Amino acid sequence: MNIWIFNHHALTPDMSGGTRHYDFAKELVKRGHSVTIVASSFHYSKYKEIKEYHNNEYLQETVNGVNFIWIKTPPYFGNGISRVKNMLSYTYKVLNIIPKLHLKDPDIIIGSSVHLFAVYAAHKLSKEYNTPFVMEVRDIWPQTLIDMGMSKWHPFIILLGWLEKYLYNKADKIISNLPYAFDHIGKFVSKDKFIWISNGVDLDNINYIEKIETDKFTISYTGAIGVANNLTLLVDAAEKLKEKKDIFFRIVGDGAEKLKLKELVKLKKLKNISIEDPVAKNEVSNILQSSDILYFNLKDSPVFNFGISSNKLFDYMAAGRVIIFSTKAKNNPIKDADAGYTIEPDNLKQLEQTILDIYSLQQSDRNKIGKKIRKYVEKTYSMCVLSDKLEKVLEDEVRKYNA
């Protein structure tokens, strides 16, 4: 198959962030398929351009057999009108640039949210090229925006609500990485139109190495540093445990709350925690493997009523370290693995005690927990296993469309 994927925020492994579509594409290329990913190169969390266009509006490159087309879009910061302009720019340019490139016609087109305008562009091109159209829902807009506080009567929300229903109706198949997305999507389509395909982890990038005890006991967090991640709690835990000289905390990533965290650490005069810049996806494993505990936290929010499918969590699990899962999502992969620790979000006392409980274990006992988590992710959330599922879905849709 020749597969086109439209994901505004797709990344390659030399960038920091999730690489769902690159990872799927790499697996599909191994199986003889051709994959082209069309993305913007303005980074969604760093808020900066990561490619040099000079006077061009797009760039083409091939990364490990995966074709990328990068679309130049205007800069933005935060979630204001400039971000909407960035979304619309991507959509407009995709519809104008892609047909002019005279690429080999696709067999199937996937349009992936977060934002629905990218999915709309994929739908329009599927009509132009007479191919099946697969809609992928990675964030349920506009419901997520309403859950975050926007009025359901805001004109932008009303527009998104109309577009959401239109795209559900036009899609030949709907995929979501969220395990309970059908609780919402099922209001509009029948069950046979929907399939859950989780995020996962490329196990080639994160080898399991048994942890050896050292003179530092390290608790690490990697990824976005935003309001939803509530990392102030981890700084507070570092303050509570500062007398334990061999316990050290690391926060590695970027986001709107990073400066605030740095100032908080400085104000508290803490020497047992570092706030570090993000690293490329293919360098994350070094941080994970050097850690004793990996911390996953999300504030309690209705946004997670449809479950979570976190690339970061699956990376943690692949590293085979003890995980503290502090989230009230509808699903819990750590509980499913029957290993690791689950605590309430925003509960400092419970976090402090859980760290001390794990700290008091023998290294061999911590390694047993880590191995169990690793085996579970190999069986359930490896990109190889998930790609089997995606490949079958796409082949079935192409077959039905051409019958």
What are these language model-derived features?
Residues 95, 117-120, 124-128, 154-174:
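Membrane-proximal helix-turn-helix segments that form the acceptor-binding/catalytic region
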Residues 1-64, 179, 241-243, 402-403:
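N-terminal subdomain of nucleotide-sugar transferases
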Residues 4, 212-238, 250:
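Conserved donor-binding/catalytic core segment of Leloir-type glycosyltransferases
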Residues 229, 276, 280-287, 294-317, ...:
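Nucleotide-sugar-dependent
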